[in-house]
């Protein structure tokens, strides 16, 4: 296994769907399947917060979501659980600034995809130095899904990172909908991530498809 190329990573970040069982009222596995069918390019298993599954139920959901990803040919990323990621032979892991040390995680996971959330220029540079394949920058917009988020910062950090000539793949995180995704890509991000914009949509497949079409248009047009 070799590390993913930056070009491939930038493509995969286009429509980055993140979801746990508690982010939808529908059957979570079905929602993941529909999002993938609609065109999600990457999926992150994020089972956190109130009503989150634990123990065997959590592992079973992860396995089913991973199977859906395999069937769709979409990489399966685990949020902040190196042990689970390694046990499942996931395609990658995503960690926040309050989670494990990125350099140590890189050493533990080998060539798997490593994503790191960053909120400042120094955190972006540190993530790149530590071996991150991409950074998640945000929160771009206000969000209800994550209760522990930092101050909303819009697209200013994305623009600043690109102005400095830093080419690490970037995905925008936080409060992104089909109506406000364009500025994120125009600022220099390679994709957008979303939870509720797909997980709580009446038709997750259609919602994912709209994101895929819009993001491709924005990326082509800049």
Swiss-Prot record:
Q: Which GO terms describe its cellular component?
A: cytoplasm
User: Which reaction does this chain catalyze?
Assistant: 2-[(2R,5Z)-2-carboxy-4-methylthiazol-5(2H)-ylidene]ethyl phosphate + 4-amino-2-methyl-5-(diphosphooxymethyl)pyrimidine + 2 H(+) = thiamine phosphate + CO2 + diphosphate; 2-(2-carboxy-4-methylthiazol-5-yl)ethyl phosphate + 4-amino-2-methyl-5-(diphosphooxymethyl)pyrimidine + 2 H(+) = thiamine phosphate + CO2 + diphosphate; 4-methyl-5-(2-phosphooxyethyl)-thiazole + 4-amino-2-methyl-5-(diphosphooxymethyl)pyrimidine + H(+) = thiamine phosphate + diphosphate
Its keywords, alphabetically, are: Magnesium, Metal-binding, Thiamine biosynthesis, Transferase
Residues the record lists as binding Mg(2+): 80, 99
EC numbers on record: 2.5.1.3
Please list the residues that bind 4-amino-2-methyl-5-(diphosphooxymethyl)pyrimidine. 44-48, 79, 117, 146
Q: Which cofactors?
A: Mg(2+)
Q: Which Gene3D superfamilies does the record cross-reference, listed alphabetically?
A: Aldolase class I
Q: Does the keyword Transmembrane apply?
A: no
Pathway(s) of this molecule: Cofactor biosynthesis; thiamine diphosphate biosynthesis; thiamine phosphate from 4-amino-2-methyl-5-diphosphomethylpyrimidine and 4-methyl-5-(2-phosphoethyl)-thiazole: step 1/1
Note the InterPro entries from the entry.
Answer: Aldolase_TIM (IPR013785), ThiamineP_synth_sf (IPR036206), ThiamineP_synth_TenI (IPR022998), TMP_synthase (IPR034291)
Quote the record's binding site residues for 2-[(2R,5Z)-2-carboxy-4-methylthiazol-5(2H)-ylidene]ethyl phosphate. Answer: 143-145, 175, 195-196
Q: What's one GO BP annotation on this UniProt entry?
A: thiamine biosynthetic process
Similarity remark: Belongs to the thiamine-phosphate synthase family.
Q: Print the miscellaneous field.
A: Thiamine phosphate synthase appears to proceed with a dissociative mechanism (SN1 like) in which the pyrimidine pyrophosphate dissociates to give a reactive pyrimidine intermediate which is then trapped by the thiazole moiety.
Q: Do you know which PANTHER family this protein is assigned to? A: THIAMINE-PHOSPHATE PYROPHOSPHORYLASE (PTHR20857), THIAMINE-PHOSPHATE SYNTHASE (PTHR20857:SF15)
Subunit structure as annotated in this protein's UniProt entry: Monomer.
The identity of this protein, by name, is Thiamine-phosphate synthase
């Amino acid at each position: 296994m070799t590390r993913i190329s930056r070009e491939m990573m930038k493509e995969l970040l286009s429509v980055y769907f993140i979801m746990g069982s508690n982010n939808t009222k529908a059957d979570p596995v079905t929602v993941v399947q529909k999002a993938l069918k609609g065109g999600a390019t990457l999926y992150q298993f994020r089972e956190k917060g109130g009503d989150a599954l634990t123990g065997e139920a959590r592992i079973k959901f992860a396995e089913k979501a991973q199977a859906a990803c395999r069937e769709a040919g979409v990489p399966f990323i685990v949020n902040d659980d190196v042990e689970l990621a390694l046990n499942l032979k996931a395609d990658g892991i995503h960690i926040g600034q309050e989670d494990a040390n990125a350099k140590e995680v890189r050493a533990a996971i080998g060539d798997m995809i490593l994503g790191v959330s960053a909120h400042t220029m120094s955190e972006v540079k540190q993530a790149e130095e530590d071996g991150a394949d991409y950074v998640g920058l945000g929160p771009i917009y206000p969000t209800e899904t994550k209760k522990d988020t930092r101050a909303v910062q819009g697209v200013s950090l994305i623009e600043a990172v690109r102005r400095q000539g830093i080419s690490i793949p970037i995905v925008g995180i936080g409060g992104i909908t089909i109506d406000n995704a364009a500025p994120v890509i125009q600022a220099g991000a390679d994709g957008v991530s979303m939870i509720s914009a797909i997980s709580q949509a009446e038709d997750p497949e259609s919602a994912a498809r709209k994101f895929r079409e819009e993001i491709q248009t924005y990326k082509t047009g800049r």
